[in-house]
A protein has these predicted regions:
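Amphipathic alpha-helical transducer elements in NTP-driven molecular machines
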Residues: 204-208
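Cytosolic regulatory/linker segments at or just downstream of nucleotide-handling modules
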Residues: 185, 215-296
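Catalytic NTP-binding/metal-coordinating core of nucleotidyl cyclase/transferase enzymes
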Residues: 71-150, 198
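Catalytic core of nucleotidyl cyclases, primarily class III adenylyl/guanylyl cyclases
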Residues: 115-147, 163-203, 227, 257
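Hydrophobic transmembrane alpha-helices
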Residues: 1-16
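Regulatory cytosolic signal-relay segments
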Residues: 15-77, 103
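A generic structural signal for short hydrophobic patches within well-formed alpha-helices
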Residues: 60, 89, 228-229
Length: 296
């Protein structure tokens, strides 16, 4: 902008002898108008970029182009929900400074968000020590069950390695709990015109959240719901589908649901052949599943 203004001043100085005063005024006005338009465009782009860091980019674009409204702006779609949280984080906060806990949480959110987006998903919400992501929501994702599992596997592997060692604090280690399920949900904006929220609603969201909360009880860090297993084509006696080895853990009555649901996990969280795979298998063997009364 300063460059345009300087150029206008120089042009006016150079052309004093060749242009009439009216022409010089018109030229200066045109250059200043271009400068103002450029400044306005930069401000709009900055506002949009900042807004897109708080909500997903497609939602930010809609907000920027539409007037506020009291109406429901949502659509029904088939998608996969991935939710993940930090286990034992509340206890960790009691023994660490606010700066350390903020750094740990920031690193977790940043790394998990990057991995989710790299696999075709979008983070819809972050609250407390948890986040919720959607595959095939605002951004199309044809193979959303497989993409969500790949993202969950990467999060468990990479984000777990970034968690601080709590041994010196004498408390249980930080760990991750992940829940995934597929189904239909309403995704969009709700609320009054002066205070809107973008979220998703549906049983698939409840299922993913309850599966995540069940991970400590079952001692499996990642749990899959029946909707996701069905879309993968999992059948009794044939759990190996599309290079994803699924293990059926049994029937469980999840909180808030009326009927028991089949719960699954990945036999191997890491890619087959990974050096850490044997450590994962050893961990799972040392932490048996829930009491047999739950299994089916």
């Amino acid at each position: 902008l300063l460059g345009l203004q300087a150029w206008a001043q120089l042009a006016q100085h150079w052309m004093l002898d060749t242009l009439s005063p009216a022409a010089l005024i018109a030229l200066s006005a045109a250059l200043l108008t271009l400068g103002e338009q450029a400044r306005t465009q930069l401000e709009k782009q900055r506002i949009y970029t900042n807004l897109a860091s708080y909500v997903t980019a497609p939602v930010a674009e809609k907000i920027a182009l539409q007037a506020p409204t009291d109406a429901i702006q949502a659509r029904r779609c088939e998608l996969t929900v991935l939710t993940v949280d930090l286990k034992n984080f509340a206890r960790y906060c009691q023994d660490c400074s606010p700066e350390d806990t903020a750094t740990t949480l920031h690193r977790f959110f940043a790394s998990a968000s990057t991995l989710i987006e790299a696999h075709g998903g979008m983070v819809e919400e972050m609250w407390g020590d948890s986040l919720l992501a959607v595959f095939n929501g605002e951004r199309p994702c044809a193979d959303h069950p497989q993409a969500a599992i790949a993202a969950a596997r990467a999060i468990w592997q990479q984000c777990s390695a970034q968690l601080p060692n709590t041994q010196a604090l004498g408390i249980e280690p930080l760990s991750l709990g992940l829940g995934l399920d597929s189904g239909h949900a309403m995704i969009g904006s709700f609320g009054a015109a002066q205070r809107r929220v973008h979220t998703l609603l549906g049983p698939v969201v409840t299922s993913a959240l309850q599966l995540r909360s069940l991970t400590p009880e079952l001692a499996y860090p990642l749990l899959l719901g029946p909707g996701l297993a069905q879309r993968l084509g999992v059948q009794p006696g044939n759990p190996h589908i599309n290079h994803i080895d699924i293990k059926h853990l049994g029937q469980f009555l999840l909180p808030g649901l009326l009927q028991p649901s089949s719960v699954y996990t990945l036999r191997h969280l890491l890619q087959p052949g990974d050096a850490a795979e044997q450590r994962t298998i050893a961990y799972l063997r040392q932490h048996p599943t829930a009491p047999a009364a739950h299994s089916g």
